[in-house]
Amino acid sequence: MIAYEVGGSGPSVVLVHGALSDRQHAFGALRPLLERHATVYALDRRGHGDSGDGGAYAPGREHEDVAAVLAAVPAPVDLIGHSFGALCALESARAGAAVRRLVLYEGVPRDGRTISPDGLANRVDALVRTDRPEAALDLVLTEVEHHGPAQLARDHRGRSWSESVAGVAVLARELEVENGYRFDPERYVGVTAPTLMLAGADSAASVRADAEAVAAGLPDARLTLLAGQRHACLHRAPELFADTVLEFLGY
């Protein structure tokens, strides 16, 4: 069962969160801003929050989950994905889910090995299986986010640390999906929904280059870099994110 929460009034908007997260952690600050203009459906991806895991995992099931929520809410529907949720959203649109407009924030790499190096998923899985979720999260933050000792100490003290640790249980499979992903514009010729590709202007150069390549490779997409932001824009500048998205959606 895929859980989702509904709030607001107006056109339908579906939100898809990324890894190490759930609907509340990812969108708690954003949802009230969007709900002034739209009916917002924030889902928990399978294995996260209140959603069940559903047995054997396959990436296509994530895309089917998003498509099922889209089909269950009043049309037309706009779809917003953050990080790994952006990849899920894009793949759902590619598979034929009915989307009026699509918003993606980072998370769609040209080559997923830049996000998830070879072997990382197996190392994370080994730590999780030996009941060391915090060590697994430290590994990812060190090798993917390049956090040094001082930043790791701040991470451990942060308000979202416990939620992130909880998300580690299914992180290895998400890293495996990213490791095998390559962006090929030919796969997305059928994604005709107008698309806004977002990235933080202060995100790593490789992340910005990924966003630029995706925007250039989709049939009807444009790129916007959010000033002063990195990957955590939803938490650090929800108003900026909301204003940018609402303008694109035309609400």
Kindly label every feature range from the protein language model.
Residues 226-240:
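Catalytic histidine-centered segment of alpha/beta-hydrolase-like enzymes
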Residues 41-80, 243:
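Active-site loop/oxyanion-hole signature of alpha/beta-hydrolase fold enzymes
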Residues 1-52:
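Conserved HGGG/HGGXW glycine-rich cap/lid loop of the alpha/beta-hydrolase fold
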Residues 81, 85, 89:
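Gly/Ala-rich beta-loop-alpha elbow adjacent to hydrolase catalytic centers
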